[in-house]
Amino acid sequence: MSTQWYPHENAAASAAALADAVAETLQDALDKKGQAVLAVSGGRSPIAFFDALSQKDLDWQHIGITLVDERIVPTDHADSNTGLVREYLLKNKAAAAHWIPMVADGADEAALADSEKAVAFALQHYRQPDALVLGMGGDGHTASLFPQAPQLDKGLDPAYAEPLLHTSPVTAPHERISMTLEAVAATPAVFLAIQGAEKKAVYEAAAAQASKTYPLSFVLNHKKVTCHVYYAN
């Protein structure tokens, strides 16, 4: 368990530095095995990072892009992380990347009503990332591992065999598909992007010890994980 802290004066500088670091990690994977997989988080915070990364000179046709977690909603829904990544990351040079889906294109709300079937689809397409970029909510959640979610224990269980699971946040909308703690820990390069004093305080509490109050704490305190934290004031 360890963390590396990279502070920046503003969000633009942090996003640019994170894009540089992720691009370097992907290039290393390409050099070693000819292909690479990156998992990213959704929300509005990563948009500047997505834009910066999309302009990097990489062999994008041999890079797969997927999600750390997804809302179980149609991919054209306003809350879909898939739609966000397609709009802001899979453009410019990164338009040549291979998309690894979590939710099937064309599946409507009725088709997605069975969450376990939705997870089964995601598992069929899952590829272990070489790098992933996590976010953190003000409640200490990361991916879709939320405090109080009934599936949190399963998502944190090192004995749980699958890399993805269905979660039902108590404090956020939509059923979710999320990478598990062990799938995150199996990723060679783990990045975390946070911004502002409020989230810094939550991060510091999470880094102090593993607690279900802050699910991110299990990543930060995992013996296999070195988490590279990009912080913007």
State each model region's role.
Residues G138-E182:
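Class I SAM-dependent methyltransferase SAM-binding "motif I" and its flanking Rossmann-like core
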Residues L112, A143-Q148, V202-A206:
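A short secondary-structure junction signal
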Residues V40-S45, L134-G138, Q195:
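Glycine-rich beta-strand-to-loop/alpha-helix junction loops that act as flexible
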Residues A52-W60, R86, P147-L156, A208:
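A glycine- and small-aliphatic-rich helix-loop capping segment at beta-alpha/alpha-beta transitions
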Residues M1-L38:
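N-terminal glycine-/serine-/threonine-rich phosphate-binding loop
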Residues S2, Q61-V133:
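Ligand-binding beta-strand-loop-alpha-helix segment within the catalytic cores
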Residues D31-S54:
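Glycine-rich N-terminal segment of FAD-binding domains in flavoprotein oxidoreductases
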Residues E182, P188-N233:
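ATP/nucleoside-binding phosphotransfer catalytic cores, i.e., glycine-rich phosphate-binding loops
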